[in-house]
Amino acid sequence: MSYAQKIVIHSKSGATNALEALVEQFISDGVRFVAVAGKDCALMEDIIDEIVVGDGSDNTRFILTSSHPGESLEEVMQFARIITEGTGEPQLIEL
């Protein structure tokens, strides 16, 4: 399964060990934007950024990220729809 260019993660349980493999798949699939809403969303955004940047030696690894504490899932989906990074409808992933 390939992921869309825009992703919204709805975190129901907070940061998870599965995040690293998921982000690596995002990079492989050409995901351009990831927004995180829900529990620990700011922490999850930081973790995603760390995974993407890695040791900093590969400047082709890039995903724009945002976190949305206190915002509804619909607000975050709307934000993802209008952001110019990436094309198409955002894909919702619940963790």
Model-derived segments and spans:
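ATP-dependent carboxylate-amine ligase
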Residues: 1-95
